[in-house]
């Protein structure tokens, strides 16, 4: 049973690192719409974008 919990914790940590694939780029923004094109240029058509603290944050969803 201890081995099961150990494997479960390892899988949890691995999934957290996979979900956190984001990059902050040096593009100023006030809305996510301003970030979408630069992020798509960087990661391709499946990229996601957010505007956080006046900078664009890109997510690789592909």
From Swiss-Prot:
GO terms for molecular function: ion channel inhibitor activity; potassium channel regulator activity; toxin activity. SUPFAM superfamilies: Scorpion toxin-like. The record marks 59 as: Aromatic residue of the functional dyad. Residues 1-22 form the signal peptide. Transmembrane segments: none annotated. Disulfide bonds join 29-51, 35-56, 39-58. InterPro entries: Scorpion_toxin-like_sf (IPR036574), Scorpion_toxinS_K_inh (IPR001947). The modification Asparagine amide is found at residue 61. It holds the Pfam family Toxin_2. Expressed by the venom gland. It comes from the Eukaryota. The keyword Signal applies. Has the structural arrangement of an alpha-helix connected to a beta-sheet by disulfide bonds (CSalpha/beta). This is Toxin Ct28. It comes from Centruroides tecomanus. The lineage of its organism: Eukaryota, Metazoa, Ecdysozoa, Arthropoda, Chelicerata.
